[in-house]
Curated annotation (Swiss-Prot):
Catalytic activity: O-phospho-L-serine + H2O = L-serine + phosphate; O-phospho-D-serine + H2O = D-serine + phosphate
Protein name per the record: Phosphoserine phosphatase
Protein role: Catalyzes the last step of the phosphorylated serine biosynthetic pathway, i.e. dephosphorylation of O-phospho-L-serine to form L-serine. Is also able to dephosphorylate O-phospho-D-serine with similar efficiency. Displays a poor activity on L-phosphothreonine, and cannot use L-phosphotyrosine, pyridoxal phosphate, glucose 6-phosphate, or fructose 6-phosphate as substrates.
Species of origin: Thermus thermophilus (strain ATCC BAA-163 / DSM 7039 / HB27)
Membership in a protein family: Belongs to the HAD-like hydrolase superfamily.
Keywords, comma-separated and alphabetical: Amino-acid biosynthesis, Cobalt, Hydrolase, Magnesium, Serine biosynthesis
Length: 249
């Protein structure tokens, strides 16, 4: 194998657990229970009503990310203007549903925007990347989302220097599981599909996309996403340490 394709969110970087922790903490301070689930549900419902939702869906930009993305990438000015009222409405409706104080919606929306800017890695991530380099593997990052937020995560986590290539769906216009994104990486390094492997936590995006591109697929099952019977990985691991231990790559 010559090329390792890697996902970012919840593969190398803790993403969903951080959003959950921040929202639950804000909920406790606001005196409401189950705040993460309520905010997530309202955000997803209202996000689907946004005029740009088909584009967001195509590039894999989530409703939770819309609660803290800066939308500072040129061309996303309309999203930046839309985001403030969207966030306030999400928190207001979540508070109303929970019997909280809806007048605190803006305060909590702004608090989440600030406090969500955390980029903790999974404990084994750095050692895994070092081992990949020791083995002489080229590293490419394939991540879905809007450019400014994904690059903020990448830099904030101190990961940028590891990758020879970074493909962000919002920059190239296509996202996982579209096999064209995987083929872009293959072409950039001049390797055949059988000389590469994709490592990611999302069966629908990472595993399915890799299989469509003819690339070996490693599912990092962190217990955050259900198994997809139509997207079977070549290797299933509990964390990144098991990838090279399996000697399947």
């Amino acid at each position: 194998m010559k090329l390792l394709l890697l996902d970012l969110d919840d593969t190398l970087l803790q993403d969903l657990p951080v959003s959950r922790a921040v929202l639950e903490d804000l909920g406790r301070k606001a005196g409401v229970e189950g705040f993460f689930a309520r905010v997530k549900a309202r955000a997803e419902a209202l996000f689907r009503e946004a005029p740009f939702y088909p584009w967001a869906e195509a590039i894999g930009h989530s409703a939770l990310e819309a609660l803290w993305a800066r939308y500072s990438t040129p061309g996303l000015e309309a999203l930046a203007a839309w985001a403030g009222p969207f966030r306030e409405r999400v928190f207001r409706e979540a508070l109303e549903e929970a019997g909280g104080a809806p007048e605190r919606a803006r305060e909590l929306a702004e608090a989440f925007f600030r406090e969500r800017r955390r980029y903790p890695l999974y404990p084994e991530a750095e050692a895994f990347l070092a081992e990949a380099r020791r083995r002489g593997l080229a590293l490419a990052l394939l991540t879905n989302g809007v450019p400014d937020l994904q690059r903020e995560k990448l830099v904030g986590a101190g990961l940028a220097h590891h990758f020879s290539l970074v493909l962000i769906s919002g920059e190239v216009g296509i996202g996982k599981p579209d096999p064209r994104l995987f083929r872009m990486a293959l072409c950039a390094f001049g390797v055949a599909p059988e000389e590469a492997a994709m490592v990611g936590d999302n069966p629908q995006k990472d595993v399915r996309g890799a299989r469509l591109a003819g690339v070996r697929a490693v599912w990092v099952d962190r217990g955050l996403r259900p198994e997809d019977p139509e997207a079977s990985p070549d290797l299933r691991v509990g964390d990144l340490r098991e990838v090279f231990l399996a000697e399947a790559l």
